[in-house]
């Protein structure tokens, strides 16, 4: 039985009725018990797609839910293993999740089955939910957390998407569940998704990075060990969103999110024009403390006025009136809280918008939802249509995901914000309803290959020493600066390097490495696949493919001064990521779709140039992570000094973070396009997005790996604090070097093709500085001046065009000469 394509099938005593949600490795169905007719939801997980980590999370979720029964926790009714599937039969929550409830709070009047809520509890002007609803949901969430605390459990992923809603309980239900708190005349909240939950003793500390960054405690974002108080920060973020209508802190990535949290210095801002009760403000401020020691504890939270004060049940509607109203709620919910990396999908034959009860109900009532009516994350203005700011929505097609992973929805995740080998991080769960990253911060092994071209690029920079950007870092944790040395990590020589095999340094004394480059290759110990050269093959290539080939297949032999190497590359080949017979931009595509792909290709070229600059610096770091030199190593293979190692790591770190920012721009553009277009994503678009997702995963994992190196090495060697390392400065100066080298080579009459490639790469690097809101540190020079950058790009482009015209003329002249020679030779032969 193929559950992924069939409905009205049976699983034990349950009948599957319709699909209500879909993720990269799980599908959620609405169903019912054949005998009792109880409506339930069935989460069907295809086990072969799960990595070891994800399977452990699933088993943990099952074991936890089997042991707990609470009125404000989603009930696990049954667990059935059938072939390749594990089916979790769970309580069905017909009102969807709290995130959509908050988002559509002003539209309840247009939905007969929900209009009763706004009769007595209208939303606050220019804020969030009605105060009574805020207190009601907070009390029910507190009840669920208090129950978990009694079982020594920490949820680790408290957010609106994991808080599901049911219609108000009946009198019979209340008699069966004396634990119920709050008002019986309001929707009932239930905590769901225990995929990241774990047992944690009061004195224990955890260190795994998981959950959704918008609601994640800063100690987790800083990779510090944390305890159950991390959930309290998440509660504060949820409480703020209920009261205000939006999260307390928003950012395009987790690094910028932490920077904004730190910049706030525990000062929580509330909208001046909205009235929010002082009791609620006080509790929010007590929960949203950066330092866990300053944060209110569980006893303080459970005894707070907001949680303990009984609600006023005064209502113009009786209990029977409410029950009559909610009887009409029969639209299936597609709440993302059931699936860790969720992407909604419409049912075949009965298309419906994703997003659960509320969004579907709007369509059922004939309500037209315009982009301007939806609040969401910022989208660059270049992607907006009709002057409206568009929401950030998950953009990853579920079918395009490789095998499973634990990594945006951004997205997932942006995330989003989607997978391959069992340990590879991807961005499928990033962008999960704008909560864009779900990762484990420990270095993870993967078979994904590093580019050999990056092994030699920039080796001319003082051998193995870092670029002369001596600067450092004073604690500003952002894409422009490296992380703070606030705690130690395990010794880096024992770390597993991302995308490398453990213990990859061979002990064979006959393996002689004469340069750091060959030592690095020895460390990688991987076979890579060739990428077709830009001139090979008669097939028509897209700009994205050409850009990738330019930046990879020729990077090593063109960009590096005085060094060539015809090694292989690890960037996705046509066989692996881009279909062999597909040209990404096809003439038959609609103009809007073609424009989208043009934008994606442009961003891909800019992102790829920054990514490889980061790869070069990472390649110089790897050989120094070995504890001792190997037989046959030369002086050039001598490890870097701790200071040089940390400086190189900082430079590589900020470049990977910049690459992540560029990739997020692409995700935002796709989200904006889909929000304003009724077109379905073409296979070409899905392939392009898949490439962005995989690159996002790689950059994120490597940046985290470098962060651990920086912290551990700085702590181990007591390195002095230096000035912040600027990604913009690194990119700017490298672009200048490339353009100067290309101009010098051109004047010397050297390889014209190599000069062209250097010009192109320099232009892409400079263009990346103009993409999105990329700020530079105070005091930055011309690299912070967009006018200067645009002028440089214009000059480089002009030089490139002149050189191309010279090449064309030279080719024509050569052909003429050859033709004349043949004509002259013909009579002689005769």
Swiss-Prot record:
GO terms (BP aspect): autophagosome assembly; macroautophagy; mitophagy; piecemeal microautophagy of the nucleus; protein transport; regulation of autophagy; response to starvation; reticulophagy
Protein kinase domain segment(s): 14-307
Any one GO molecular function term: protein serine/threonine kinase activity
Catalytic activity: L-seryl-[protein] + ATP = O-phospho-L-seryl-[protein] + ADP + H(+); L-threonyl-[protein] + ATP = O-phospho-L-threonyl-[protein] + ADP + H(+)
Keywords: ATP-binding, Autophagy, Kinase, Nucleotide-binding, Phosphoprotein, Protein transport, Serine/threonine-protein kinase, Transferase, Transport
Region of interest (Disordered), ranges: 448-480
Residues where Phosphoserine is found: 346
Disulfide bonds: none
EC number: 2.7.11.1
Coiled coil spans: none
Disruption of the gene: reported phenotype: Impairs atg8-processing.
Active site, renumbered: 157 (proton acceptor)
CDD domains: STKc_ATG1_ULK_like
Gene Ontology cellular-component annotations: Atg1/ULK1 kinase complex; autophagosome; cytoplasm; cytosol; fungal-type vacuole membrane; nucleus; phagophore assembly site; phagophore assembly site membrane
Alphabetized Gene3D superfamilies for the sequence: Transferase(Phosphotransferase) domain 1
Processing after translation: Phosphorylated. Dephosphorylated under depletion of nitrogen.
Superkingdom, natural source: Eukaryota
Role: Serine/threonine protein kinase involved in the cytoplasm to vacuole transport (Cvt) and found to be essential in autophagy, where it is required for the formation of autophagosomes. Involved in the clearance of protein aggregates which cannot be efficiently cleared by the proteasome. Required for selective autophagic degradation of the nucleus (nucleophagy) as well as for mitophagy which contributes to regulate mitochondrial quantity and quality by eliminating the mitochondria to a basal level to fulfill cellular energy requirements and preventing excess ROS production.
Family the UniProt entry places it in: Belongs to the protein kinase superfamily. Ser/Thr protein kinase family. APG1/unc-51/ULK1 subfamily.
Subunit structure: Homodimer. Component of the atg1 kinase complex composed of at least atg1, atg13, atg17 and atg101. Interacts directly with atg13.
Protein name, as recorded: Serine/threonine-protein kinase atg1
Gene it is expressed from: atg1
């Amino acid at each position: 039985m193929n559950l992924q394509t069939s409905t009205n099938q049976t699983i034990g005593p349950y009948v599957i009725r319709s699909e209500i949600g879909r993720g990269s490795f799980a599908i959620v169905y609405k169903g019912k018990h054949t005998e009792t007719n109880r409506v339930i939801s069935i989460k069907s997980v295809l086990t072969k797609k799960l990595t070891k980590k994800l399977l452990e999370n699933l088993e943990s979720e099952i074991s936890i839910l089997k042991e707990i029964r609470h009125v404000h926790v989603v009930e696990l009714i049954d667990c059935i293993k059938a072939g390749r599937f594990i089916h979790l039969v769970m309580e069905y929550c017909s009102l969807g999740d709290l995130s959509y409830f908050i988002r559509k709070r002003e539209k309840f009047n247009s939905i007969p089955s929900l209009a009763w809520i706004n009769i007595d509890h209208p939303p606050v002007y220019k804020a969030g939910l009605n105060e009574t609803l805020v207190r009601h949901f907070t009390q029910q969430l507190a009840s669920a957390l208090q129950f978990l605390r009694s079982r020594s459990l920490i949820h680790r992923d408290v957010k609106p998407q994991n808080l599901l809603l049911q219609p108000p309980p009946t009198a019979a239900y209340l008699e069966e569940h004396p634990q119920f708190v709050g008002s019986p005349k309001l929707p009932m909240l239930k905590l769901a998704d225990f995929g990241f939950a774990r047992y944690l003793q009061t004195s224990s500390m955890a260190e795994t990075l998981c959950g959704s960054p918008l609601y994640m405690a800063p100690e987790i974002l800083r990779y510090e060990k944390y305890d159950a108080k991390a959930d309290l920060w998440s509660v504060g973020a949820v409480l703020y969103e209920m009261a205000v209508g939006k999260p307390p802190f928003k950012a395009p990535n987790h690094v910028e999110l932490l920077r904004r949290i730190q910049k706030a210095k525990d000062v929580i801002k509330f909208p001046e024009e909205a009235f929010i009760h002082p009791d609620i403000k006080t509790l929010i401020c007590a929960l949203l403390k950066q330092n866990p020691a300053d944060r209110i504890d569980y006893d303080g939270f459970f005894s707070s006025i907001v949680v303990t004060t009984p609600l006023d049940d005064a209502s113009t509607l009786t209990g029977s009136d409410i029950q009559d109203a909610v009887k009409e709620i029969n639209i299936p919910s597609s709440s993302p809280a059931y699936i860790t990396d969720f992407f909604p999908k419409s049912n075949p034959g009965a298309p419906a918008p994703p997003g659960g009860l509320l969004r579907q109900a709007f369509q059922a009532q004939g309500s037209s939802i315009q982009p301007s009516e939806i609040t969401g994350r910022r989208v660059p203005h270049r992607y907006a249509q009709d002057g409206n700011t568009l929401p950030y929505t998950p953009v990853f097609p579920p079918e395009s995901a490789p095998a499973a992973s634990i990594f945006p929805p951004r997205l997932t995740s942006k995330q989003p914000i989607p997978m391959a080998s069992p340990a590879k991080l991807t961005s499928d769960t990033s962008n999960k309803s704008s909560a864009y990253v779900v990762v484990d911060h420990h270095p993870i092994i993967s078979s994904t290959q590093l580019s050999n071209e990056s092994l030699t690029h920039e080796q001319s920079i003082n051998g193995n020493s870092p670029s002369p950007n001596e600067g450092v870092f004073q604690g500003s944790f952002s894409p422009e600066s490296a992380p703070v040395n606030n705690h130690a990590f395990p010794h880096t020589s024992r770390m597993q390097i991302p995308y490398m095999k453990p213990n990859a340094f061979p002990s064979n004394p006959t393996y002689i490495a004469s340069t750091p480059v060959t030592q690095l290759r020895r460390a990688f110990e991987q076979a890579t696949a060739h990428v077709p050269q830009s001139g090979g093959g008669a097939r028509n290539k897209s700009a994205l493919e050409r850009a990738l080939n330019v930046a990879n297949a020729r990077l090593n032999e063109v960009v590096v001064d005085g060094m060539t190497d015809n090694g292989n590359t690890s960037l996705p080949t046509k066989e692996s990521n881009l279909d062999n017979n597909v040209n990404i931009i096809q003439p038959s595509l609609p103009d809007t779709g073609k424009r989208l792909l043009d934008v994606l290709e442009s961003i891909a070229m800019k992102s790829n140039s920054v990514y490889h600059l980061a790869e070069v610096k990472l390649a110089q770091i790897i050989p120094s992570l070995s504890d001792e030199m190997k037989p046959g190593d030369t002086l050039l293979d001598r490890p870097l000094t701790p200071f040089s190692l940390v400086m190189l790591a900082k430079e590589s770190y900020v470049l990977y973070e910049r690459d992540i920012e560029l990739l997020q721009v692409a995700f935002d553009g796709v989200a904006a396009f889909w929000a304003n277009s009724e077109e379905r994503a073409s296979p070409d678009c899905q392939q392009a997005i898949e490439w962005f997702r995989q690159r996002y995963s790689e950059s994120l994992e490597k940046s985290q790996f470098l962060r651990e190196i920086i912290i551990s090495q700085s702590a181990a060697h007591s390195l002095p604090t230096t000035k912040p390392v600027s990604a913009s400065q690194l990119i700017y100066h490298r672009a200048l070097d490339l353009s100067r080298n290309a101009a010098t080579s051109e004047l010397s009459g050297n390889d014209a093709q190599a000069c062209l490639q250097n010009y192109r790469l320099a232009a892409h690097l400079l263009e990346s500085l103009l993409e999105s809101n990329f700020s530079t540190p105070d005091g930055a020079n011309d690299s912070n001046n967009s006018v200067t950058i645009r002028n440089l790009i214009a000059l480089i482009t002009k030089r490139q065009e002149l050189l191309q015209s010279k090449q064309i003329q030279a080719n024509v002249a050569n052909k003429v000469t050859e033709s004349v020679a043949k004509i002259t030779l013909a009579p002689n032969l005769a």
